[in-house]
Structures are given as C-alpha cells and as structure tokens.
From Swiss-Prot:
This is 3',5'-cyclic-AMP phosphodiesterase. A divalent metal cation 1 binds at residues 736, 772-773, 890. Hydrolyzes the second messenger cAMP, which is a key regulator of many important physiological processes. Vital for female fertility. Required for learning/memory. Its EC number is 3.1.4.53. PROSITE patterns: PDEASE_I_1, PDEASE_I_2. The record marks 893 as: Binds AMP, but not cAMP. Pathway: Purine metabolism; 3',5'-cyclic AMP degradation; AMP from 3',5'-cyclic AMP: step 1/1. Residues 1043-1054 have a biased composition (Gly residues). Residues 70-84, 488-506, 1060-1070 have a biased composition (Polar residues).
Amino acid sequence: MSQESNGGPAAGGGAAAAPPPPPQYIITTPSEVDPDEVRSMADLELGSPEKQVQVQSQKFSSTSSTTKVATHSFSMSSSAGTTGQQSKQDSAQQIQQLQQLQQLQQLQQQQQQQQSQRIISSSTRSQSLQSSTIVGEATTITSGAAQILSASAAASLAQQLKAQSSTSIITSSEQRTSTSTSSSSSTRYIASGSSNLAGGNSNSASSASSKTRFQSFLQQPEGAHGFLTAHQKHVRQFVRSTSAHSEAAAGVAGARAEKCIRSASTQIDDASVAGVVESAGNLTDSSATGGSMQLSMSKLGLQQSSSILISKSAETIEMKSSSAGMRTQLTLSGGFLAPPGNRKITILSPIHAPPGLHDMLKRAQGRSPLSPRISFPGSDSDLFGFDVENGQGARSPLEGGSPSAGLVLQNLPQRRESFLYRSDSDFEMSPKSMSRNSSIASERFKEQEASILVDRSHGEDLIVTPFAQILASLRSVRNNLLSLTNVPASNKSRRPNQSSSASRSGNPPGAPLSQGEEAYTRLATDTIEELDWCLDQLETIQTHRSVSDMASLKFKRMLNKELSHFSESSRSGNQISEYICSTFLDKQQEFDLPSLRVEDNPELVAANAAAGQQSAGQYARSRSPRGPPMSQISGVKRPLSHTNSFTGERLPTFGVETPRENELGTLLGELDTWGIQIFSIGEFSVNRPLTCVAYTIFQSRELLTSLMIPPKTFLNFMSTLEDHYVKDNPFHNSLHAADVTQSTNVLLNTPALEGVFTPLEVGGALFAACIHDVDHPGLTNQFLVNSSSELALMYNDESVLENHHLAVAFKLLQNQGCDIFCNMQKKQRQTLRKMVIDIVLSTDMSKHMSLLADLKTMVETKKVAGSGVLLLDNYTDRIQVLENLVHCADLSNPTKPLPLYKRWVALLMEEFFLQGDKERESGMDISPMCDRHNATIEKSQVGFIDYIVHPLWETWADLVHPDAQDILDTLEENRDYYQSMIPPSPPPSGVDENPQEDRIRFQVTLEESDQENLAELEEGDESGGESTTTGTTGTTAASALSGAGGGGGGGGGMAPRTGGCQNQPQHGGM
C-alpha cells in the first residue's frame, strides 16, 4: 500500500531537507476498509520552520512548478468514473485551472505587500473525491473563505480567529478549483497529505440522491443544528480527551501542555461546526461528496491539530486530532437521517505510545499517564462504541448569556481520588453501584473496558450520590426489562434527551434472551436485586428533605468514619478530627434521631445537675460582657471623612492613592491569574487591597456600566467597607477579602462558565466575596455561641458571623454616598440582595458538607440522565453553582503556590492561637487547633486537604473539567509537601513527669488481662507513641497506647474530648 509523505515538494537549492518524521498509524474504521489494513495519518503534521520556508520558496518560485502541482492535484482528485470520462474531465478542468492560476499570480503580489498568506493545496480521501484547501490567517480569512463559504460562515470563522493569532483554519469543498498563493515566510505552512485507499466509487445516481436528501435535511428548521447540538458534548469530549496524551507527552518534553490543550479544545464549537455544515450544504456539484474544516494550533512547543469532515451523503462525520505526535480519530457513523439507535461513535487511538513514556511519567509524576475512558483503547483491535442520542434541536443548551445557558459535563481523567469514592461498607450498597457509570457506554462493553483500561482510579465516573445511584439503577432495571421481555422500547413518555433504545440494555439488539438460558436467569436475578435496592433507598427518604440531603448524610457518615480512624492514629489526629467535625459539619440532623426525654432518665437528670453545678462558675466567667442594644447592628462605625473625599473629577487609577502606582498597576494587570501576589498588592496599595482589587475587577468587567454604578460611589462604599474589616486580625482582614474576591474573579473566567451568568449574577458574586467577612472579630461561630455573645443571641446561634457580615454590609449601603445600587430597578435590587444573602450564608463552614452534597448530586444526576449538559435554567441551580464558586474561593489557599499557602497558614494559625489564649484566660475549654502549646500544623493541613478541600475542588473540577486541572495539581503538590514535613511522633509527654505512678496504674489495670495482651501492651509501652491529653490527672499509659494504636483504653482513664464529632472512638475497658 503506497503512502505519500506530507509537507509538499522537496526543498531544492542545494539545501538538504530535514528528514521526514516517521509516520503514525492507526486502524481505520471497519466500515471503510479491512480491519487489518493500516494507513498513514500524517496529513496534519506541521513541518519545521526551516522546512516551511524551503517548501514555500520552491512551491511558488515559478508558474510552471505551480502548474505541475495543481495539475497533479487535480488528476488525483478526479479518480472516479471510467477512464474515458476521466480524461475528458481532466482536459476541461486543466484549462480552467490554468486560467485561474493567472489570476492567482496577481493576487499573490497583493498579498505579499500585506504580509499575509493563503496556501491552497489538495488532498484525496477514501470514499470521497477530494477538493482544494484554503488556508487563511485572521487578517485575510474573510476574503479567502468567501470563495467557498457563505458570508455568514466566513464571518464566524473570522470572529473565531480574532484573538487566536497562532491559529490557522482550513476549510474545503469538493467542486472548487485549486488555487495557490504565497506570502511572508513567518506564517506557518500547513500541508495536506493524500492517501488513496481502496473503497470504490459511488455512482452518479446514488450521489445525486444523497445530495438531495442531505440538502433537504439541512433545509429543515432544526435538523442540522439539532443534531450537532446533541453531539456537541461528544465533539468537545473528543478534542479534550485527546489532550490526555498531549499532557503525557508534555511530561517527557519538559513542557506543560494544559494551556495549549485548553485553547485548542475551545476551537471546535457551535460556530465552527455550523460553518462545516454550511460549507457542505453549499456544494452543488454531483461529484462533490463533502466539506471539512480543520484547525491547527502551536503553543509552548506543542502542536495541536483537529479536523472535521462531513460527507456529502451524510453517512459519516469524521473528526481527527493530532497533538504532540499523538493522533486519534473519531467517526460518527449512521448518518444524519439514520434513527438515533443506529448512530454510533467509534474512537480509535494510536497503536503505540512513545517509547518509555509510561515508565518516565511514573518516575516523574508518581502516577500513570492520564487515560480517559472510552477514548484510548489499550490495543489496536479494541474499539469502543456508544449510542448517540437525538437531542432537542429547539434551543442549544450551550447558548450563553441566557437564563438557560448550560455546562457541558465531562469525564474526569485519572487522579488521586477523595474519600467520597471509598466504600461505604457499613451500609448496603446497590449491587451495581461500584461499577455504574454515566450511562454513556453500553453495558456490553463494561467487561471489555475493565480488562483493557488499567490504573485509572474512578475514571469510569463512579457514582457516589444516592439519588444518582437510584436513577442509574432504575435505568438499568428498565433496560434489563426490555431484554427479558423483548418488548420494543417506547419513547413516548420519555424526554428526547433521555430516550433509551434497545441498544442501551444489557444485551445488544438483535440478540434477545430466551427463558431458561443461564444469561436470562442471571439477568433476571440482577434486576430483582437492583429493584429491591432502589425500593429500600426510596423507603428511607424523608418527605421534608431534598434528595441532596441523602448525599449530605452519607458524606457526613463517611467523613465521621474516616476521622474515627484518623483520630486513633495519634493525639494530634484526634485534635484535628475534632476540629474538622466541629467546624465543617452541621449537626442539625442530630435532632431528628430518636432519643429518650430527659425526665424519663433519672440517671441523666442527676448527671446533668452535677455538671450544671460545676459549670455554673465557668459560664459566668466566659459570658461576654453586655453589648449594645440588640436593636442596633454592632460594629457599624460612623461615616468617616473619606466618604466624601473623592470630590475632584479625576479618580485614582486603581481606586487608591499610592506613591507606588506603577508597581501596583503591574500586579493588578494579572488579576485574571490564579495565585497572584496578593501580599504585594496590599503593600503597594497602602493597606487598601480590597478597594483597589474590587475597583479594578469591576472596571475590567464593565460592571460599573452594566449595573449603572457611579465610580465615585463605588469607591466611597469600598473604602467604607474596608475600614470595617478589623486590621488587627491576622487572617480575617481586608487582605483575605481581596484574595477571595480575586479568586472569585478567576473562577468566573473559567471557559466552561463563559456566557453562563448574567452581569447581575457576576456582580452579585463579586460583591458577596467583597463583604463576606466584614467586621469579623477573629473568633469562630462556636466561640460566640459558647460564650453567649450578643451576636449569637441576636441570630439564634445560626450562622452568627455570616448573618452579621450581611447586616453590616447592607447597613453601610445606607450611608450617604455609598449606595452603589441606587440606579437599579426595584426588581433587580431585590434579586441581587437575595443572591448576595444566599452566597454569604453559604460561606458558613458548617454548611460545607451540604454544599458539597448538593453540587455533586446535581452533577451526577445530570450525567446519569444521559443529557451530559447541566441546564442552569432556574434560580436554584444557578445560585448553587455560584455558592460553591465563592465557597471554593474562600477555601482556595491550599490551591495557591506554596509560598502563598504557607504564609496564609501561618496567619490563620496565629488567629486560632489568639482565640485559644482568650479561651484559656476565660477558663473555657480550648477549641481544637487553638492551643499554641499543643498543635501540629503540618498534619492538620494534610487532614484539612484530605477531608475538606480536596473533595470540594474535586467536585468543582468535575463540573468545569478540564479548566481546574492546574488547581488540582497544585493542591496535590502542596499536600505532598506538608505530608513530607510532618515530624516524627514524640514520646508521651506525661510519662516522664511521674513514670512510677503511671507504671503502677498501668500494671493494676492489666491484672484482669491474659498474658498475651500483657506482653503486647508492654511492647507498646516500651516503643512509646503519642499520648492523648496531657497535663490532666485522668491521663493513663493505656490511653497513650491507644493513641498510638496499641490497643484499648485503661480503667479509670479519661477519654479524649470528642467535641462535636459523632462516632468518635471511646476508650473503654478491655
């Protein structure tokens, strides 16, 4: 089988051309050629810059050489029909070709003056007569593309290239003549290779019939757009999944490809696909068989190329992607007019990865290369197919800027998973819950996938939220029922985007099961088990709770289980577990548990009475002094002089007067960058970081104009707001507010969220980030509740500080010259106020697990439903995403570069220690992690990341994949750093104070134990370990051993405090 190399004629002039790279091979789809046949796929390869200059100079050096190339290309593209007809067509079209070449010479001179380039080449493909190709740069794409596309298609392509100077677009159409031009050598040269494959020629009758049917389909109001909309997620998934190999290769090349991949993956979108359809629809010649669009990008030394080919007969849509030497092909077969059940997607991968890639990445990164499911089979003979559903064509769910704008949900690549994906073995699970995935792959391929794909964690989109598991189980029951009964599926009662065909069932269509077969019996048994599990789960749902509460309760239960094991490891582990439980778990569900009334339990009454007498004095000492009248909002100061200080026409460039304006402007120019030097901004802004950050962000987003906010009023309010942040707080000050606001701005810029939220929603989220900690006293909610503060009484112990922040902020808006929303309509103002209240209340850390469960349930439910698109078409869904976005920004310190993260950790711990000092002085119990004499910072950060931060960012990354992969990588690196910094466990501190007393008590305690346990405990006593609580009379060596994992507790010993955490280990007798 002949293979023609790509890249144009050989360079002449005595200069030796660079040797061509070895071709990459893939297996073509079985419907096209024999499965054993291999062909080259180097048609998108980019040559070296030197070779590009040589090729261009020789190709356009003379008219004769250009004529030869065009004539040869034309003869290749005219291979159909009989020999006589072919020669006649060649003769006629060669004359026309030569005439057009003369016109091209004139066009060439004009373009040389403009320093731009349009290169025209030709290529041939199997089962289609090829055409010419036009390559255009952004400056000339309109005039170039107008020759083969309509004006609207050319405009859309030009708009795509507006901000992509390094991108080239190739569009082709089958009956256009070949043209060629040249320009400056600085423009990259893209050559289209050719490969002739046996496949036969289509007769003229069938071609004309196909053309008529295709044009008729395109003329339908919602035909083509609806079909492409339904497949939009697959198109994006194809391009993005190819980036996995590009990321892997980047590790070898020493470059990071994420930015390159992210830019390239956004190129194939609604506009470009629509351009391809329009290109194909404009073809009128009966010999034309299709149109194509190709995209090429080169960044960071890596090359990303993608192409789409739509055949004229609507039989296939073929997409190819080439990234860093890795090529992948995807084919949508079945045609536009085929029933949804007959449409298939086939994905083929390279046969071989680069030599040594896997081993090198394992050594460099400690994990295997990313390998998304359904995209890259392990061998050349493994093909993955999944059904393509016929989505709604009335409105694209990807349309931005509207209340119905949605998010395309992607599959996460392999990475370290959080505890949410571990087995909840204490409770009954669905029989298939551990292998259930997002209903993309057919059931019959599950075993094949499991045997091929290795080292991929939860790459199958493992479902962990109970409601999504119930939906998946019911879908499985429905599909199994279709197989068992052989009843044809009816889609009358199903929404179009959730229609299930017979091919979704456990058995492929055309192979029904008959009663009495072993497979029939096994499938029936599995179906009954699945249905029983669904019924059990539904029976436990409480009617007054939402379905996301099921996930919240499950996650809290799993977290308690994890922390129980964590607390048993050491004294510090117990303290960290208690801190996490008391801070991040809302314990409201405890009131729903059945319990005895106090008066029904005399022993409990007596114990409470004794405890009350002992704590009466302590309560009196810890109670906060009487504050201002509760009818007033505490913390609101009198209007300061700066409220009316901006009297001149000129406002400060960045909202603050500073002698270091140039340095400040340089840093503020990076406000869209994750991990900005926020501490330097605070220094250069004369301790006004919140004002300058907020003002710059609102200016750059044009929110002052769209929300009709007077700039002077905005600066007045921000200055007043910043004055109400307590500067003496080490952590909760205006610098923290500026950091959260800047992080919120970056997350709002996520490509997946582009055009999703309105300016009012964006402004509300940023405003909420600005005010979310105003007048923070540097104390926790639990401290305020325990000390019976005026704030806790005012807000009934519920989100005390968050309610106070909102009250202070909205009260400040009433100051003269500070109402930034004065020009809004009443309805808009009410909507924004509600949004801000919801977002700020969600920053209460005790609501963390509920927020996480709500978001994960929403994402997984949409994936199980089969739509793959999260339609944010109601307030609840939209505010839920914004709440989690700001919550992520509030917990973003561990995801920042390590120097910033370490500095934030030091400030937060100092604030905790100050609260602990205050608790010690008041005779109160010192809160977890607040005792400066007994804290392990490194281990606390590892636990904080493992149980709180990583599960949250993991879910967010699932929502906006792949836009948060860099953040997750940084988080894992920071976690590994603190893990490596954990000091070795010290010996028990209480043993040295009175070793003889501890030894005696230890021996007396073990008299009732057998000799084996005695020997084990004595070994543990000699080896030492971390003790539990120090400095108390109830501390025993047995409890110290328990803390070190040496066994049970000792008699008479007092167990460690377990705060607000349920299911903590209680050290009882053996």
